[in-house]
Amino acid sequence: MESRGKILMERYELGRLLGKGTFGKVHYARNLESNQSVAIKMMDKQQVLKVGLSEQIRREITTMRLVAHKNIVQLHEVMATRNKIYFVMEYVKGGELFEKVAKRGKLTEVVAHKYFQQLISAVDYCHSRGVYHRDLKPENLLLDENENLKVSDFGLSALSESKRQDGLLHTTCGTPAYVAPEVISKIGYDGAKSDIWSCGVILFVLVAGYLPFQGPNLMEMYRKIQHGEFRCPGWFSRKLQKLLYKIMDPNPSTRISIQKIKESTWFRKGPEENRILKERTLNENTTKNVALVLGVRRKKNAHEDVKPMSVTNLNAFEIISFSKGFDLSGMFIVKEWRNEARFTSDKSASTIISKLEDVAKALNLRVRKKDNGVVKMQGRKEGRNGVLQFDIEIFEVTTSYHIIEMKQTSGDSLEYRQLLEEGIRPALKDIVLAWHGDE
């Protein structure tokens, strides 16, 4: 793209590359008139239109203009040419808070307390303006030259006007490890409550050096999030533990509010000095945990060693193998299986099973159960590339909420997609809450 030293719009001299993502790059730049250092986010117009990001960009601009707070990265101006869109933003010199955690392994409660107070101040301000961030995580928290926190990246933010008539937001946004259980359920959620949950996960990560909710795969992590299953390590002060359990309450209606957080003893007074331990050198286990916080993924099959949901009649699940696109984390996780599909259902296990059996019969598919409890479904005739075959697993998040995952294991991919789109998806519409990957 633009090389170092290039003059942009006769106003900015472009410098080094600060970072890049799927849809753009961020460069350091200098205002030629004021000599002020800025960061310029550059996006290709055609690519934005092609992938349907125009609404998200409009929202980001609107949001950033609504918020002006010392702990929020400021948007100075937006410029455009025929081919490019340029966001001129405050340049934050200190880098990501995320990098600090990765380098040290964890922070003391005293340091984490300072950052958490600044985070809550910024989030509370946003909420007072009807703005919800929806993607709060350490990577979106920057530090200035004075070690003060700055919240960035409003690309997923939602305005209060985006709510439906029920007063709730309905878009699944955010990064899996930091997302609230009600967001996962995709049944509508209060943006303020979901941001509070994410703040709690961030606080835990800062002091622990690892994520509160972990599992061998995404489904198990989601299950733990839904049930609020986490434990605080021994070096957490008692008051911090008490606050975290109130913040990461899986029930949004009883979850602590920002006002109550600000009134809590730990938030107002900080940790007890005699409870604070010195930061330790990263050991092998902590390094592994930090890798999880950083989002480093194992190359191993994401479903390896998963204990399947114990449903009486797993045969029913075989029929699910024909769906496409339900990935609750479709925005964030790169799928390791090309022909994998997931969907959610709010029906009971018995209803799902019955429906799957009906669909299998209608589509002339053979259903059989494997020894490890995974259901295998296959065609009765050999296709262009052998017999079409699928593995199916059902994961119980709650008794009335299930995630069904399907994976093609053999046969022709084109035949699989055709069967999925023309046969399976239409046949399962009565039990599907959402195909993940669909808008």
Curated annotation (Swiss-Prot):
Its cofactor is Mn(2+). It is an enzyme of class 2 (transferase). One of its GO terms (molecular function) is protein serine/threonine kinase activity. Keywords: ATP-binding, Kinase, Manganese, Nucleotide-binding, Serine/threonine-protein kinase, Transferase. It catalyses: L-seryl-[protein] + ATP = O-phospho-L-seryl-[protein] + ADP + H(+); L-threonyl-[protein] + ATP = O-phospho-L-threonyl-[protein] + ADP + H(+). Residues 338-367 are annotated as: PPI. Residues 153-182 are annotated as: Activation loop. Its EC number is 2.7.11.1. Residues 298-333 form the NAF domain. Pfam families: NAF, Pkinase. ATP binds at residues 18-26, 41. Residues 12-267 form the Protein kinase domain. GO terms for biological process: signal transduction. The active site is at residue 135. PROSITE patterns: NAF, PROTEIN_KINASE_ATP, PROTEIN_KINASE_DOM, PROTEIN_KINASE_ST. The activation loop within the kinase domain is the target of phosphorylation/activation by upstream protein kinases. The PPI motif mediates the interaction with the ABI (abscisic acid-insensitive) phosphatases. Belongs to the protein kinase superfamily. CAMK Ser/Thr protein kinase family. SNF1 subfamily. CIPK serine-threonine protein kinases interact with CBL proteins. Binding of a CBL protein to the regulatory NAF domain of CIPK protein lead to the activation of the kinase in a calcium-dependent manner. This is CBL-interacting protein kinase 14. The gene is CIPK14.
